[in-house]
Amino acid sequence: MKPIARALISVSDKTGIVPFAHRLQARGVKILSTGGSAQLLQKNNIGATEISTYTGFPEMMGGRIKTLHPKIHGGILGRRETDATTMAEYNIAPIDLVAVNLYPFEQTVAKPDCDLATAIENIDIGGPTLLRAAAKNHAAVTVIVDPDDYERVLREMEANGGALSSSTRFELAVKSFEHTARYDATIANYLGALTPNGEKSAFPRSYNIQFAKKQEMRYGENPHQRAAFYVEQPPPAGTIATAQQLQGKTLSFNNIADTDAALACVKAFREAPTCVIVKHANPCGVATGINLQEAYERAYAADPVSAFGGIIAFNEPLDPTTAKTIIKRQFAEVIIAPAVTTTAQEILTSKPNIRVLACGEWSSQTAAGWDYKRIVGGLLLQDQDTDTVPLEALQTVTERSPTPQELKDLLFAWQVVKFVKSNAIVYAKNGRTIGVGAGQTSRVMSSQIAELKAKEAGFSTQNAVLASDAFFPFRDGLEAAAKAGICAVIQPGGSRRDKEVIAAANEWDMAMLFTGMRHFRH
């Protein structure tokens, strides 16, 4: 491969472009550039030739047409041997490197005050055309769309006499096509969500999203299934997608799915140190405490059998005392927290197979995004189930109101039940779960399982509270809970037989709250 002799630079994101161009110039590379990029380079003593000077054709239409010229695209697309005669005939010089990034369409339309006209003006035309041309002809041209690649390209040029390997050019070309695909997908999503009268729908006519492969796995949910882990571009902070693995074996398919479930649940608790232990995507123990150690001990005690080999999630940085308690008490597949102190990390190294993750802090203001459910031949798309019921919106429907402690436990249980597979019943007392009934086709059966779990763990269900993810269709489910000693219930309400269920609660002197919000989870 011949050394790079001529480069075209046209960037919206000017991060690192000046030192990059300086080093290209030092290697004798001739630089072509456009508008603001050319001005910046010239201001920094870089001899960049403006495109309009090079082509003899001015920029026009307010900058809409800059690089759409045969002398530019011929220089990029020309096959160095096959098209050499044509290039010479029309005085088209080869362009060996294209460094381009695009108008910030995604950032522009994310602004609340962005109107359609502004969005349209931020649709880049020349940039994607340059990138696609350079990527297509990667056999002869290096294309750079990401400022993070400048240093890598320069190092390879310095090591190879100014040239780049075919493998590097191919990799950068693929990256360029991925970038333009995502760019066009963002435009299509934005415009496709607009109605003819200018209103915006939450759901575009076609839905386009790009995920980048982060990890290939030994297998999927089961050993006979192939699998890989893909993450959104860009992935949201404070998630399994961005978590840093501090130690342990490679995360498996099931590890990632279960850790995501545990993290989603623990994020719902912001006011006290909280621990969530998950098994097969269902919380088996959730508890708050005065510190993380107490929260963990209480969550573990809620279901010690199920906690074995589970996923442990915390809403605060993991400290040494809690880390020591965990490794003395149980085997865990994964521990995840916003951060892990240095001493806690040192303690955990005594159990090198435990996967320890630091996911970073999360913000309650961070957009939750979409929930995807794949079906054969399609995709179901919905909001994440992150809505909460304001305290003032809770409706006491029984003769007796909950006591302050009952109310506190009801709100705690209500936060947990939305993360349990339907039909879901959660028994709770004093800020922790004591029994979880998950995934049953009968709500009565889920309640019975929750009671059984509580008794197996040595808890009394007397004066515990119950949360149900959906309404009780009949009074029998409520009566079963009352017989177990449940003193207060929180549920959505909305059954045709609500009056019968309320009557049953009154007969047993139970307090019951209606939330008006269902939390099915499938």
Swiss-Prot record:
Keyword field: Hydrolase, Multifunctional enzyme, Purine biosynthesis, Transferase
This protein's record includes keyword Hydrolase: yes
Pathway noted in the entry: Purine metabolism; IMP biosynthesis via de novo pathway; 5-formamido-1-(5-phospho-D-ribosyl)imidazole-4-carboxamide from 5-amino-1-(5-phospho-D-ribosyl)imidazole-4-carboxamide (10-formyl THF route): step 1/1; Purine metabolism; IMP biosynthesis via de novo pathway; IMP from 5-formamido-1-(5-phospho-D-ribosyl)imidazole-4-carboxamide: step 1/1
Domain MGS-like: 1-145
Biological processes per GO annotation: 'de novo' IMP biosynthetic process
Family of this protein: Belongs to the PurH family.
Protein name: Bifunctional purine biosynthesis protein PurH
Organism: Nitrosococcus oceani (strain ATCC 19707 / BCRC 17464 / JCM 30415 / NCIMB 11848 / C-107)
Lineage, top ranks: Bacteria, Pseudomonadati, Pseudomonadota, Gammaproteobacteria, Chromatiales
